[in-house]
A protein has these predicted regions:
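Intracellular loop-helix junctions on the cytosolic face of multi-pass helical membrane proteins
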Residues: 1-12, 93-99, 103-105, 117-210
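Helix-loop boundary and gating motifs at the non-cytosolic
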Residues: 2-57, 101
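Residue-level signature of the transmembrane alpha-helical cores
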Residues: 16, 81-91, 107, 114, ...
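Transmembrane alpha-helical cores of Major Facilitator Superfamily
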Residues: 18, 51-58, 86, 141-149
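Core transmembrane helices of Major Facilitator Superfamily
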Residues: 23, 85, 110-122
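Helix-to-coil boundary motifs at intracellular loop junctions of multi-pass secondary transporters
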Residues: 34-39, 73-74, 125-133
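Central cavity-lining transmembrane alpha-helices of secondary-active solute carriers
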Residues: 46-71, 90, 152-155
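C-terminal ends and interior cores of transmembrane alpha-helices
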Residues: 61, 81-102
Length: 210
């Protein structure tokens, strides 16, 4: 009978999906609405938002294959993972402060690129976290499921603050600042178990010729 209980390393890997999914959900539900509220009157909000998404995708397409290849070498995977998480979290936390569309879009693009970049290294860590190859699918499915469930908690808290904050003297701008901070803290906190408990055991040795 196959072992179904997850190890500390496997649980730590799963938890990062709980953390980053909070930003994914916020990006799809609240961020476009908030962006429309700070965009200049008469501007094409849909076009601007579409450009931002396109730019983020292009940057990711250009950078991630290179970084992914570099991360295969000993000691690099966690460094790149931590760098993308930290930059992404900082940009997420700052999203509530710009009052104009362009600074907001710049922060959003960087946060989105870093989120997706961290996912490249996160997925690469699966082979290091799983106890054996035959557990890869099981651990991955737990990550997907718990990511979906866990992302709802900070999102619901953020939604309540944004929608009902006026009852407590909190306007939408302040509510969104709080929502971005909640999401950033959640994202960062759930990255820590992976950083602490999952180590790169599958890697290429640097032969010094690069």
């Amino acid at each position: 009978m196959a072992k179904t209980k997850m190890t500390k390393q496997e649980k730590s890997w799963v938890l990062y999906d709980v953390g980053n999914s909070a930003f994914v959900l916020l990006s799809s539900a609240l961020i476009p609405v908030y962006f429309k509220s700070i965009a200049e009157p008469g501007s094409s909000v849909v076009v601007a938002w579409g450009y931002a998404e396109t730019v983020a995708s292009l940057i990711l397409a250009l950078l991630m294959p290179i970084l992914g290849s570099m991360a295969d070498y000993k000691g690099n995977k966690k460094k790149f993972f931590m760098a993308t998480v930290i930059i992404g979290v900082i940009c997420c936390a700052l999203l509530g402060f710009p009052s104009q569309a362009l600074p907001f879009l710049i922060l959003y693009v960087v946060a989105a690129v870093m989120l997706n970049g961290s996912m490249v290294f996160y997925d690469a860590f699966l082979v290091d976290a799983a106890e054996s190859d035959d557990r890869l699918d099981m651990v991955s499915s737990h990550g997907y499921a718990w990511g979906y469930i866990g992302s709802c908690l900070p999102f619901i808290a953020s939604l309540v603050i944004v929608l009902f904050g006026s009852n407590f003297g909190i306007d939408m701008s302040t509510g969104m600042k709080i929502a971005f901070l909640i999401t950033a803290v959640w994202w960062f906190a759930f990255s820590l178990p992976l950083v602490r408990n999952v180590h790169q055991v599958n890697y290429k040795e640097d032969d010094g010729t690069g």
